């Protein structure tokens, strides 16, 4: 498993810079997408020098950059794979609406990358969950989800149905587990093509 260790620019004091997935994602068609961030302080994390550095490696080819940062001026935000859980195989975005996840911005993403979307409300203590990846994550064969955080039973049934169609094993998380970020799981692949779940 290859890990890229990138240093932050100390003078910028970006305390959340260890979450680059909120400002950039990379896709199989060699597209990179840059996202509109809600917190003005976090917008400094977006760095073209990082994209140029990654392009030096054979495993990273960037042929197209889709920059959605312009949506920030209209108050529309979409914080990468924090806001969205991507089913990259079936081109479906799962997203719970929040102050950091605007439907307008999500629609722009879906149109530009040819995804369909499943939008729902998810809460903890009656407050919207700020990022979808807190309560859900997808691997090729697994789906971690905190169903009890989803307000509408119809949404739960629809999401579970989609997981079933894609033959993913559903792993249910409790609210307590979600609060401890048990839903924030990544699937990575090593050089032998073997998948691993990390958290």
Give residue ranges: language-model regions.
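The feature marks the mature, well-folded catalytic cores of soluble enzymes
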Residues: 1-199
């Amino acid at each position: 498993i290859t890990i890229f260790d990138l240093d932050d620019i100390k003078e910028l004091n970006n305390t959340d810079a260890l979450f680059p997935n909120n400002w950039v994602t990379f896709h199989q068609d060699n597209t990179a997408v840059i996202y509109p961030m809600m917190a003005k302080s976090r917008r400094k994390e977006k760095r073209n020098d990082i994209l140029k550095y990654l392009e030096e490696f054979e495993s990273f080819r960037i042929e197209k950059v889709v920059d959605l940062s312009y949506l920030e001026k209209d108050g529309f935000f979409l914080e990468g794979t924090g806001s969205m859980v991507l089913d990259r195989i079936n081109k479906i975005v799962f997203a719970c609406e929040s102050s950091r996840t605007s439907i307008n911005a999500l629609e722009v993403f879906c149109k530009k990358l040819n995804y369909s979307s499943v939008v729902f409300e998810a809460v903890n203590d009656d407050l919207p969950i700020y990022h979808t990846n807190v309560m859900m994550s997808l691997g090729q064969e697994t789906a971690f989800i905190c169903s009890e955080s989803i307000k509408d039973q119809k949404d739960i049934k629809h999401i579970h149905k989609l997981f079933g169609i894609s033959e993913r094993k559903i792993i249910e998380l409790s609210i307590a587990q979600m609060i401890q970020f048990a839903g924030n799981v990544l699937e990575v692949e090593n050089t032998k093509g073997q998948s691993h779940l990390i958290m």
